[in-house]
């Protein structure tokens, strides 16, 4: 019996452990909607959209910009800006410690990235929220980076696109955070006065001060499929009005049906459809027409 344990069972267990440890972490991903187990490299090919149920998973700001803009001619705006704990705010934890933890987790200095570049040959400037950074909350640096992107659009007369994913204003910055709602709204008013298109893309989720300001001020407002969009969460609203709310009333499909947004576009169609839309809004040739002209020339 002892020989069998030594010669057969123990080596078998050791081989099994070696196999387990050799599987890279994060190679498989479980869809939060249909619970299908998906192979990570294949999921990346579908832009983090479940091939089984079409669930649009949350992705980071840099990943979103990377799949949206052309590869060449990119330049980040306001990358040097860093948040400062001006109020020495503390709840259960110091704000500066929360910032340090979020920066370590995401590799970003704050919750918004702005970048100039091209969309299928059309010059544009893009901002994208990083939800993993303190819930994509809007503080002074988020507001300033957004304004710098808008100013770039004004100076270069190019369209601006913003991908929102946020829980709202950053409570640790108090009034400074709330001021960003006015600041971003004011610069968008300038874009509108100058006739420069601003497209707002609402991704999952968009709430609070962001939904009450810049996210809903687009000339065209686009939602990703089944994105949660609102001001307060469903539970808070139900407790306030003391009524049961309709199923999915904060989903992008419900908002489209009731006229709160203009379009729902799947992630894999965003590049071509927004490029065509912006070409029409700016009077420039569509990417398809530009290719035809180049081919004839």
From Swiss-Prot:
Q: Which reaction does it catalyse?
A: N(6)-carboxybiotinyl-L-lysyl-[protein] + acetyl-CoA = N(6)-biotinyl-L-lysyl-[protein] + malonyl-CoA
Supply the EC number(s): 2.1.3.15
Q: Which GO terms describe its cellular component?
A: acetate CoA-transferase complex
Question: Which Gene Ontology terms cover its molecular function?
Answer: acetyl-CoA carboxylase activity; ATP binding; carboxyl- or carbamoyltransferase activity; zinc ion binding
Which parts of this protein are zinc fingers (C4-type)? 31-53
Cofactor dependence: Zn(2+)
The annotated pathway is:
Lipid metabolism; malonyl-CoA biosynthesis; malonyl-CoA from acetyl-CoA: step 1/1
What positions does the entry give for Zn(2+) binding?
A: 31, 34, 50, 53
Q: Name one Pfam family in it.
A: Carboxyl_trans
Q: How is the cofactor bound?
A: Binds 1 zinc ion per subunit.
**InterPro entries recorded for this chain?**
AcCoA_carboxyl_beta (IPR034733), Acetyl_CoA_COase_Trfase_b_su (IPR000438), ClpP/crotonase-like_dom_sf (IPR029045), COA_CT_N (IPR011762), Znf-ACC (IPR041010)
Give the subcellular location: Cytoplasm
| PROSITE patterns from the UniProt entry | COA_CT_NTER
- Provide this UniProt record's keywords sorted from A to Z: ATP-binding, Cytoplasm, Fatty acid biosynthesis, Fatty acid metabolism, Lipid biosynthesis, Lipid metabolism, Metal-binding, Nucleotide-binding, Transferase, Zinc, Zinc-finger
| Family assignment from sequence similarity | Belongs to the AccD/PCCB family.
Quaternary structure and interacting proteins, as annotated: Acetyl-CoA carboxylase is a heterohexamer composed of biotin carboxyl carrier protein (AccB), biotin carboxylase (AccC) and two subunits each of ACCase subunit alpha (AccA) and ACCase subunit beta (AccD).
Known role: Component of the acetyl coenzyme A carboxylase (ACC) complex. Biotin carboxylase (BC) catalyzes the carboxylation of biotin on its carrier protein (BCCP) and then the CO(2) group is transferred by the transcarboxylase to acetyl-CoA to form malonyl-CoA.
Q: What's this protein's name?
A: Acetyl-coenzyme A carboxylase carboxyl transferase subunit beta
**Biological classification of the source:** Bacteria, Pseudomonadati, Pseudomonadota, Gammaproteobacteria, Pseudomonadales
